[in-house]
């Protein structure tokens, strides 16, 4: 089993989207968003190599997996430490170039 760490940047994006979801669509929607995130974290604990490893604009050291419509977890697998590091959450409708720098 792998340990999943969540970066402050990813946590901040998750918090922002959950607040926005609650404001626009209600608390139940925000809770479903957080549940979807937790489900993917559970998958990563058990099967860390899931997700896509080759996207055109994402550096090859990262893998990505979708967890909510338009929201992707960007993560690295550190097999030597049995650890997964969720680095960022991107919205595929927006320019995520700041993550690539």
Kindly give the residue locations of the regions a language model identified:
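Extended aliphatic helical segments
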Residues: 4, 13, 41, 64, ...
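Basic, Lys/Arg-enriched alpha-helical interface segments
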Residues: 1-58
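Basic/aromatic recognition patch in beta-strand/loop cores that engages polyanionic ligands
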Residues: 47-80
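Enriched for short, Lys/Arg-rich terminal
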Residues: 71-101
């Amino acid at each position: 089993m792998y340990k999943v760490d969540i970066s402050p940047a990813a946590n901040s994006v998750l918090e922002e989207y959950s607040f926005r979801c609650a404001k626009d669509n209600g608390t139940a929607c925000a809770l479903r968003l957080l549940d979807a995130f937790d489900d993917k974290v559970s998958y990563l604990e058990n099967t860390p190599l899931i997700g896509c490893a080759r996207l055109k604009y994402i550096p090859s050291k990262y893998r990505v997996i979708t967890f909510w419509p338009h929201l992707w977890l960007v993560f690295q697998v550190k097999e030597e430490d049995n650890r997964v590091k969720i680095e960022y959450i991107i919205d595929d409708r927006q320019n995520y170039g700041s993550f690539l720098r």
